[in-house]
């Protein structure tokens, strides 16, 4: 209803009706009145034993709650997210147990009774497809090459990339075993950033964030593809909600000021709000400048249940949740067989938000509100003016008295 499929890669504007504009304006108005919460956010690398380990803890303290995000590249890159109803909750790490074959119980948020929500997200594999003979929108988008297991990557020491001023840190990795030299000049980077207040990043897709979220930016740079038209993707796994998987939905908007020609926002929700959520726009970029010309479509497969034994093992997920868990997985693929692609500059970047509480809701920008006011106001003024004209004309004729 809000988008049309363009000739090259994505969505182009469709003309909405005035009634649609009015309904969207009315529906979005309450969200524009919601308050913004500021949190005291700290970011630290938890010291490992006996050697430094990549365990990043983000603690966001609000007026009566605390959010914990624990990111790690022990095994595949993963994050454990925990929301508590106290400002005093703390993270406890048992390093000797965490680095053991059975790390269950090594990671805790105390007091346990304060935990209101917890889940995890694991980035298990880097996917690559040969899209030479693939059709638009096909799933999978071509013949798959053997995937790269992210549990078999070597990751940098994140202490060297820790930026406390911007509340960010980079996990940068390469395969431990790279017989073809595909990553000789390349790397895969997971950039994590936290926020103490609401706002938008300077670069597209400029997702609206609050103090309740972290942003993850995934960048594949300089790696040699195994084909002339390779498409890349990520396999993502999360904990199921009992026997069921989290829900995935799409939200549409007529406002594309912050992400030109992209009118859709995808959401993964763990249960009903307020709980946890993952948000992203279905767009990636093949150039560092992230102009519209370098935009790539991002497609998500259906979320499905999967066996834990089929996924790379995540020590921090087992450390917090134990070994008996139901997992759900889905794939994200970036690009299409035609148009711009990773092959242009050997660059791919995609962003998402991960948070707890109520997902951020976009309100209409001043520019779009002005356009809507004109679109809705002009017909109304014409109708009002026409009515006044007819009324005055009727009164003029009714006051006329014949001289006879």
UniProtKB/Swiss-Prot annotation:
Q: In which tissues is it expressed?
A: Detected in brain, heart, liver, kidney, lung, intestine, testis and spleen. Expressed at highest levels in kidney cortex. However, another study reports highest expression levels in lung. Expressed in myoblasts with expression increasing during differentiation into myotubes.
Query: What biological-process GO terms show up in the record?
Result: positive regulation of transcription by RNA polymerase II; protein localization to lysosome; protein stabilization
PTM text: Highly N-glycosylated. N-glycosylation is essential for GLMP stability and for MFSD1 lysosomal localization.
What is the reported phenotype of gene knockout?
Viable and fertile. Significantly reduced levels of Mfsd1. Splenomegaly. Reduced size of epididymal fat pads. Enlargement of liver and spontaneous development of liver fibrosis which is not present at birth but develops shortly after and reaches a peak at 4 months of age. The liver phenotype is associated with increased expression of markers for inflammatory responses, apoptosis and oxidative stress. Livers show local foci where hepatocytes are lost and liver sinusoidal endothelial cells are replaced by ordinary capillary endothelium. Reduced liver function.
InterPro entries named among the record's database cross-references: NCU-G1 (IPR029382)
| All ranges on the Cytoplasmic side of the membrane | 392-404
- Residue ranges of the motif Lysosomal targeting motif: 400-404
Q: Where is it found, in Gene Ontology cellular component terms?
A: cytosol; lysosomal membrane; lysosome; membrane; nucleus
Q: What is this protein called?
A: Glycosylated lysosomal membrane protein
